[in-house]
Amino acid sequence: SKYCFCGSMDLKDYYDLMFWNQDDHYLVHVGSNKGKLALTNEFEETKLDLKDDMKKIEFTDKLKNKDISKQYDNPDWKTKGSDKCLSCAACTTLCPTCYCHEIKDEVTLTDLKKGDRLREWSSCQLKSFTRVAGDHVFRDARTDRFKHRIFHQLQYFKERYNVEMCVGCGRCITHCPTEIDFVQIINEFEDKKKK
């Protein structure tokens, strides 16, 4: 994908197989024993000269600085990102690591002692996601929701688990109907900072 920035993320220890599309075939790098097992069961080993293929792999280290901690109050989040955002949740629906959900209780009206507690997939980009009793919404402004997703992917998760949540696949950018490229936005912040 032209929007892939996986080279910017700390993925060296966190994959089974990495695929690079080379038009009529794929280059595959094995990253774990599970990945090796998957290949030995499904494919025959071949010996190829990959020098030309390796030159074709697009450089994917596109994010200039993952430390966005000092950018939270930057007013450009609104003008460059959230003003264009439709809150459609395409970014979070297609993200392989987003896991936001809501809990709902369904009570059986014929027997009030029975019911189900359900976890439904949701999105932090939806205004209703942070709505609580009393109709209070914690992230009412679209800018707050927009920033929250990016900070959760690159900052908050890393602070807690010491690894970025984002894998850099670029699906959120590729499928955004208004073509919001948060990597480009962060890089512009970085360029401004250097001036």
Where are these regions (language model features)?
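Ferredoxin-type iron-sulfur electron-transfer modules in oxidoreductases and energy-metabolism complexes
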Residues: N65-D83, H101-H175, E179-K195
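A short, glycine-centered helix-capping/turn motif at helix boundaries
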Residues: C88-A89, C169
